[in-house]
Amino acid sequence: MFKKILSALCALPRTLRCTPHPKLIMTLLVKNEEELLAHNLEFHHAMGVDGFIITDNNSTDGTPHIIERYRKRGWVLHVINETATDYNQKRWVDRMVMLAKNQYGADWVINADADEFWYSPNNNLKTELCTTHANVLQCAIRN
């Protein structure tokens, strides 16, 4: 019995174990977000996000140029130019999460919209994540 429990504990996802320096990736699904996107990337990078994976769904404004600017800085790790018109948000977000985990080694993934800003009272999201053994967190939303 002890061996089964030990085996199960060893098989737990990395995120259930306390990770002293977690890798935090944010995924963004955007379309025509030139007004907010740079602010979002700057804010979350300052809050400890290590990198961004962005799916751009047929933007016709300056959004692709902003994405490219931050890709050149090394902040945007991966860009998916989604040309489909069916807006399959679940599939697209799941794809970004799997990339974050499998290709970029994310311990934590935050999915957000360009108008969502994730805040930590100590100004570092990773510090908050280091204190938990959970693999999913619930956060308060304020408008």
Question: What do these predicted ranges mean?
Answer:
Residues D50-N58, H78-E82:
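Short beta-strand/loop segment that forms part of the nucleotide-sugar
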